[in-house]
Amino acid sequence: MRGPKPTLQEIVLDLCPYNEIQPVDLVCHEQLGESEDEIDEPDHAVNHQHQLLARRDEPQRHTIQCSCCKCNNTLQLVVEASRDTLRQLQQLFMDSLGFVCPWCATANQ
């Protein structure tokens, strides 16, 4: 191309009819040999399910955002609990547990 704008004469298209479909080999011909490193033995195998269950029992920090039951101000709590304990706390929230902000707590005393 010469000049700032392409012209039709400068564009060269090399079009060939492609009527014949050529097959493509999609088979992988790779062969793997047996190796002692690749064989998982029960002593060296990692049990991921056991690790996940153990992690559930570990206490983790969770941020809970709720409203004051008196003035509806937003409260933010940080708790450290296991997954099961957090579920119990969630049930308490759904049932009858209410939180009071520090301002409403001191005003009512």
From Swiss-Prot:
PTM note: Highly phosphorylated.
Motif (Nuclear export signal): 86-94
GO biological process, one term: symbiont-mediated suppression of host type I interferon-mediated signaling pathway
Cytoplasm recorded as keyword: no
Region (E7 terminal domain): 1-41
Motif (LXCXE motif): 26-30
ZnF (unnamed) residues: 68-104
InterPro entries in alphabetical order: Papilloma_E7
Predominant location: host cell
Subcellular location: Host cytoplasm; Host nucleus
One MF term in the entry's GO annotations: protein domain specific binding
GO terms under cellular component: host cell cytoplasm; host cell nucleus
Keywords: Activator, DNA-binding, Early protein, G1/S host cell cycle checkpoint dysregulation by virus, Host cytoplasm, Host nucleus, Host-virus interaction, Inhibition of host innate immune response by virus, Inhibition of host interferon signaling pathway by virus, Interferon antiviral system evasion, Metal-binding, Modulation of host cell cycle by virus, Oncogene, Transcription, Transcription regulation, Viral immunoevasion, Zinc, Zinc-finger
Domain characteristics, as noted in the entry: The E7 terminal domain is an intrinsically disordered domain, whose flexibility and conformational transitions confer target adaptability to the oncoprotein. It allows adaptation to a variety of protein targets and exposes the PEST degradation sequence that regulates its turnover in the cell.
Family membership noted in the UniProt record: Belongs to the papillomaviridae E7 protein family.
Job description of the protein: Plays a role in viral genome replication by driving entry of quiescent cells into the cell cycle. Stimulation of progression from G1 to S phase allows the virus to efficiently use the cellular DNA replicating machinery to achieve viral genome replication. E7 protein has both transforming and trans-activating activities. Induces the disassembly of the E2F1 transcription factor from RB1, with subsequent transcriptional activation of E2F1-regulated S-phase genes. Interferes with host histone deacetylation mediated by HDAC1 and HDAC2, leading to transcription activation.
Assembly, per entry: Homodimer. Homooligomer. Interacts with host RB1; this interaction induces dissociation of RB1-E2F1 complex thereby disrupting RB1 activity. Interacts with host EP300; this interaction represses EP300 transcriptional activity. Interacts with protein E2; this interaction inhibits E7 oncogenic activity. Interacts with host TMEM173/STING; this interaction impairs the ability of TMEM173/STING to sense cytosolic DNA and promote the production of type I interferon (IFN-alpha and IFN-beta).
Name of protein: Protein E7
Gene: E7
